[in-house]
């Protein structure tokens, strides 16, 4: 097989820069990273200077994703030789154990890292990833809660915890996690949308009102969020048909649901879909409007 430099007529400097770009973008295109990186390592290691070490790490992670343990081990051995005792290299060793499904060995290694450095967030997160891979959701939740006691500002961890609670159908705790995220990211429409979905799932008039409010907020932040638009329709429709809702509340929510249904209708008309797709999409919206008319009568 021809080399990357020959196939694409690129220089090793361009390949190095491409690897850097993928790192900066957190790209997980493992096959490409492995192909370009392996050629850099094999043919241009002496020219890369200190960049070689981060490329070894990058290629190793890609090789683990792709099932190339031979390449992953080679990169790991080079890193061990250069950085003996490094916690970062030990974490990479743990990730190789994970890829081999040697979870107990990986956990023991991460625990040793944490004994030496309790603030090592990467090792803690790897332990949580293992619990999830093993299907031990309760343990993953416990570990995440312990982690967040020390690193309360980690938004990624709060979102991961919310997802785990949703999987366990513990919607009250999931809502709490999403509230934490919305406090620090009030302009993130996806957090508003997900919070609205959780409240919708919890049900009951009060939760449905909150659901409608946050679906509306998600739409305000991103008027192209179709999921929030459908959510607004559904939550308003359920409030309008709720026997505990006052007459004014029913009237207002019929208006909100009607507006949402019309917006959905317009969105499909502007989407440039095929006539057949548009026909079925519009029929679904017409059914929504019909339901509203039944509720209103």
Swiss-Prot record:
Signal peptide: none
GO BP annotation list: protein insertion into ER membrane by stop-transfer membrane-anchor sequence; tail-anchored membrane protein insertion into ER membrane
Chain positions of TPR repeats: 87-120, 155-188, 192-225
Compartments in which it is found: Endoplasmic reticulum membrane
Topological type in the membrane: Peripheral membrane protein
Record keyword Nucleus present: no
InterPro entries: EMC2-like, TPR-like_helical_dom_sf, TPR_EMC2, TPR_rpt
Residues found modified as N-acetylalanine: 2
PTM annotation, UniProt: Ubiquitinated when soluble in the cytoplasm, leading to its degradation by the proteasome. Interaction with EMC2 prevents its ubiquitination and degradation.
Cystine residue pairs: none
Sites of N6-acetyllysine modification: 255
SUPFAM superfamilies the UniProt entry points to: TPR-like
GO molecular function: membrane insertase activity
Gene Ontology CC terms, in alphabetical order: cytoplasm; EMC complex; endoplasmic reticulum; endoplasmic reticulum membrane; extrinsic component of endoplasmic reticulum membrane; mitochondrion
Key words of the record: Acetylation, Endoplasmic reticulum, Membrane, Repeat, TPR repeat, Ubl conjugation
Subunit and partners: Component of the ER membrane protein complex (EMC). Interacts with WNK1 (via amphipathic alpha-helix region); promoting the ER membrane protein complex assembly by preventing EMC2 ubiquitination.
Family in the record: Belongs to the EMC2 family.
Annotated function: Part of the endoplasmic reticulum membrane protein complex (EMC) that enables the energy-independent insertion into endoplasmic reticulum membranes of newly synthesized membrane proteins. Preferentially accommodates proteins with transmembrane domains that are weakly hydrophobic or contain destabilizing features such as charged and aromatic residues. Involved in the cotranslational insertion of multi-pass membrane proteins in which stop-transfer membrane-anchor sequences become ER membrane spanning helices.
Protein name: ER membrane protein complex subunit 2
Gene: Emc2
């Amino acid at each position: 097989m021809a080399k990357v430099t020959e196939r694409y007529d690129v220089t090793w400097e361009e390949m190095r820069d491409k690897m850097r770009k993928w790192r900066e973008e957190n790209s997980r295109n493992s096959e490409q990273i492995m192909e370009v990186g392996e050629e850099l390592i094999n043919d241009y290691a002496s020219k890369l200077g200190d960049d070689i070490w981060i490329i070894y790490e990058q290629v190793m992670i890609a090789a683990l994703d792709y099932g190339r343990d031979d390449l992953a081990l080679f990169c790991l051995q080079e890193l061990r030789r250069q950085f003996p005792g490094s916690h970062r290299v030990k974490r990479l060793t743990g990730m190789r154990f994970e890829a081999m499904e040697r979870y107990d060995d990986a956990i023991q290694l991460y625990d040793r890292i944490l004994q030496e450095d309790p603030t090592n967030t990467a090792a803690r997160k790897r332990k949580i990833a293992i619990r999830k891979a093993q299907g031990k959701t309760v343990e993953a939740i416990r570990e995440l809660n312990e982690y967040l006691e020390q690193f309360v500002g980690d938004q990624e961890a709060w979102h991961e915890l919310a997802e785990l609670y949703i999987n366990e159908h513990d919607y009250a705790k999931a809502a709490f996690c999403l509230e934490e995220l919305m406090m620090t990211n009030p302009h993130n429409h996806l957090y508003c949308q997900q919070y609205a979905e959780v409240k919708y799932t919890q049900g009951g008039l009060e939760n449905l009102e909150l659901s409608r409010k946050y679906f509306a907020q998600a739409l305000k932040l991103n008027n192209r969020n179709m999921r929030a638009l459908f959510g607004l329709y559904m939550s308003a429709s359920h409030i309008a048909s709720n026997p505990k809702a006052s007459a004014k509340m029913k009237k207002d929510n019929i208006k909100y649901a009607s507006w949402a249904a019309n917006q959905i209708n317009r969105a499909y008309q502007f989407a440039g879909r095929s006539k057949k797709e548009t026909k079925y999409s519009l029929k679904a919206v017409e059914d929504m409007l019909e339901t509203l008319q039944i509720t209103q009568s």
